[in-house]
Amino acid sequence: MKIERVDLIPISIPYKHAEVSSRVSRGGVTDVVVRVVADDGRIGWGECCSGADTLSIVAAAQAMTPFLIGRDPRDVQSIKRDVFKKGLWDYRVQTGNFTWAGLDMALLDLAGQEAGLPLWRLLGGRGSTEPVSYFCYLARDTSEGLRRQCAEAVAAGYEHFYIKVGIDEAEDERMIADVRAAIGPERKIRIDANEAWPLPVAAKLIARWDAAFDLDFVEAPVRARPVKVMAQLRQRVSVPICANEGLGSETETLEMITGDAADVLCFSSYWVGGMQSFMTLSRTAELAGNKVCKHTHGEFGIAAVAHQHALLALGDGSRGHQQTASVMEDDILQSDIPIRTQPLWGEIDAPGLGITVDADKLDHYHKLFLADGQFLPWAATVE
């Protein structure tokens, strides 16, 4: 089996509501869908994360494509080595990682199809018999709106509730209080400040809000670099600290682990350049006593499925992984993935990623991108 063609299709799908944090304000997700066609007619699917600029990811993927053509898609690691070393993407690591992760998914999809096995089996088989658990992503809202969001999520079975903070202290506190009142004392609350606070403010707010509302963990409360800032905060508070920003490469992620700066690492194959790197660093984090929470920048079903395979293989007992499937207006897969409507997701039986892309939806949301451009991270277009 050899790779004949690589197609790159940027698409935009709106959120049900705007995503608003201390860093971003956007109305939907724009990513680059990857379609890798093999000489036997098989198709592998992937999804590149856009980050700041979609067209730069398209350009990066185009630059990487010559290293794929004519190669066996099962030779993932040697292709990656050529892309980053001969293609010099090791000098543009974050863009390279965001791009390569999507190509990597497509190659692994083809490898699984050729083997007749779901990807999680190629990644080592089930790490646990438990289904993978995902969180409820709450929108910043009025008290009434948050009560409604929480009631629907509790009815659907969610145990982990996540909300963005770091914008307005009083408003943040009101929303956390609303969530705790709505979900009861047993369910978990996680907050994400996206590096909004200086160290003294972070220490004060975390202590106060944990005493009042019992926080499960706090994500990115302070800047991730230098690592000692997070490490100092971790010594000053009793709440587990989660790192996300600052995990932009294999080296940075390893530094966060060895620097004892966080209790939880929130990242994905996008951050570290491919599924094997994500698996390796997740295992390394586990050996160091950390938990791993799968991160999402906002994703379509392709990326969600790919990472579900990885989480099935990891099986480290972490719960409440990140997802945006439940807050997207639509998807491009023919069948809804389970986490569109519920928090739990079990085995995937079909070979490779085990997905079928809806050609009409793919075309529709590609045309939406062509007409309106990407959902910019600083310009929400829906309420």
Residue ranges and their predicted role:
Residues M1-G44, C49, S326-I332, T381-E383:
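Structured beta-strand/loop patches that form or line metal/cofactor-binding pockets in enzymes
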Residues I3, V34, G41, M64, ...:
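Conserved, mostly hydrophobic/aromatic
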Residues R5, V37-E114:
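Metal- or metallocofactor-binding catalytic centers and their adjacent structured scaffolds
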Residues M64, A207, D214, R225-C242, ...:
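Shared catalytic-loop signature of beta/alpha-barrel
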Residues W100, L138, K164-D168, N194-E195, ...:
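Glycine- and other small-residue-rich loops at beta-strand/loop junctions that grip anionic moieties
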Residues L108-T142, V357, K361:
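Catalytic pocket of metal/acid-base enzymes, prominently hydrolases
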Residues G124-V237:
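Metal-dependent enolase-superfamily TIM-barrel catalytic cores that perform enediolate-based chemistry
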Residues L353-E383:
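Extended hydrophobic packing segments that form well-structured cores
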